[in-house]
Design a protein with these regions (language model features):
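Long, compositionally biased, intrinsically disordered regions
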Residues: 20-202
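N-terminal single-pass transmembrane signal-anchor helix
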Residues: 1-30
């Protein structure tokens, strides 16, 4: 009877151990796939912007819609996307970093673009355009209401100086705030003129 009980206990221990190992493996594999998916998305932004910067054009612009969420092994992972600029030996660096919305201090993945162009990042605070300083984050949250699920990039070349501008906007099924009359692009353009710069021409 004692041997039978011990065998059952050993079997239970084995089952629990196997369950723990499988759960640990699944969790870690899921995290690896998630990080890879997020990094791939961020690198897509960096590569596209790099192509915009090195192209022989004097003005270019493009909206970037970001995913509403990422999915890892059937689980929805909601996140925030952080854009910031930092100094770099080449000139400037535009940094993209995605954080799990449940754990904002946890960076899922990051990517960056180093360029000799000047980088300027703007936010909209209380309806007013604000230019962010170095390492200040522009935070996009596709789950916010109203959504901040896109950013817009504009490349300008004035007097030989190339500048890459980035600012937030929203794209929904029925509307967008990125460009056009009354758009955030128009507001940033007006901000530049008011501060001695030139309006966007593209």
């Amino acid at each position: 009877m004692i041997e039978f009980t011990l065998s059952k206990i050993n079997l239970l221990i084995l089952v629990v151990a196997l369950f723990s190992i499988i759960s640990f493996f699944t969790l870690n594999v899921g995290k690896i796939f998630l990080v890879g998916e997020v990094r791939q998305e961020l690198e897509k932004y960096s590569l596209t912007l790099n192509g915009m910067v090195i192209a022989p054009t004097t003005c270019d612009s493009k909206p970037f819609a970001i995913p509403s969420k990422f999915v890892s092994f059937g689980n929805n992972v909601f996140y925030t996307l952080h854009l910031s600029r930092a100094p770099d030996p080449l000139g400037s660096r535009l940094i993209f970093a995605a954080s799990d919305i449940r754990s904002p201090e946890t960076v899922l993945a990051a990517s960056s673009l180093a360029t000799d162009a000047e980088i300027r990042v703007y936010d909209l605070v209380g309806g007013q355009v604000v230019e962010l300083g170095e390492l200040e984050d522009l935070i996009l949250d596709p789950q916010a209401v109203p959504p901040r699920n896109a950013f817009y990039a504009v490349k300008t070349v004035i007097g030989g100086q190339e500048t890459l501008h980035a600012f937030p906007c929203a794209i929904t099924a029925n509307s967008q705030t990125c460009f056009g009359n009354g758009s955030i692009k128009e507001q940033v353009s007006q901000y530049l003129v008011a501060n001695g710069g030139r309006a966007f021409i593209c």
